[in-house]
Amino acid sequence: MGRIAALTRNPVMIALVAMLAIAGCASKKTPNNAADLGLNGAGAATPGSAQDFTVNIGDRIFFDTDSSSIRADAQTTLARQAQWLNQYKQYAIVVEGHADERGTREYNLALGARRAAAARDFLVSKGVASSRLKTISYGKERPVAVCDDISCWSQNRRAVTTLSGAGS
């Protein structure tokens, strides 16, 4: 009891306790609309910007296990990408191929290369100039989700279309 009495007589401790009590009572402002998030409304990225591409078009597609075949949902995304890329021709494009953590490094690099090539070929089939496109495989080296679970693995089986040049 002597310690507590000594602490309550210390002005620094009293001030510290008071500040903690006040801070604990303060309400936290949480963003509740797009303006608070700095987006100025959904999809408010400047048309033709790299942010516009990522936010409004979608920069990635996903693959089934051990596959480089373009799924129906991925075809929709790639078709939107091609339309956007054909409208905004100032960008150079790199298609990154990725794989999940299962398999050897060599196998996943080759699988990532096939995925990037499949996405590139689809974009070319929709009119995007092949001279603007490059591919790279990261295999399993750059996961977006890390855990030993199918939900993580499925997020890592992807191709990502990245833009460079023109103020991206």
Swiss-Prot record:
What is this entry's stated membrane topology? Lipid-anchor
Q: Specify the signal sequence span.
A: 1-24
In this record, residues modified by a lipid of the kind S-diacylglycerol cysteine are C25
Pfam families, per the entry: OmpA (PF00691)
User: Keyword annotations for this protein?
Assistant: Cell cycle, Cell division, Cell outer membrane, Lipoprotein, Membrane, Palmitate, Signal
Where do the OmpA-like domain residues begin and end? 50-167
Q: Which GO terms describe its cellular component?
A: cell outer membrane
Q: Where does this polypeptide localize?
A: Cell outer membrane
Q: Which GO terms describe its biological process?
A: cell division
Q: Which cysteines are joined by disulfide bonds?
A: none
Q: Describe the subunit structure.
A: The Tol-Pal system is composed of five core proteins: the inner membrane proteins TolA, TolQ and TolR, the periplasmic protein TolB and the outer membrane protein Pal. They form a network linking the inner and outer membranes and the peptidoglycan layer.
Its family? Belongs to the Pal lipoprotein family.
Q: What is this protein called?
A: Peptidoglycan-associated lipoprotein
Q: Which gene encodes it?
A: pal
